[in-house]
Amino acid sequence: MRQFQQIRFFVIAFFICLLLGQCQQINSNADPINRHADHLIYTHHARCRMDCRHITETEVREILERGEIDYKKSEPDAKPDPKYALEGNTSEGQHLRIIFAPSQRGLVVITCIELGVEWQCDCH
């Protein structure tokens, strides 16, 4: 009888672990940033980079809405705010990487990079 209870305990524990694993998997598929933020907050650095690289606010929104998160270039555990690198091509043909940081104030645009093109920017 005692052996039956032990087996039953392990079977139940196994199914609970399976269920928790599925829940974590479902949550990990959720997008960590609001891709339809009403208001973006641009840092001075982002504005400077956008200006010298000819990147418009419309293109920033394109990448936000349709870009892929590059987790190798992102810092999801950064404090106080995580940072996510989104990459994609704009309708103008630019291949961009834009760093976004969700914060309590809103979605902050940290910097904008045109991949594969070297621009001479004097942004400090």
What does each of the following model-derived ranges do?
Residues 2-124:
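Ribonuclease/tRNase effector modules and their secretory precursors
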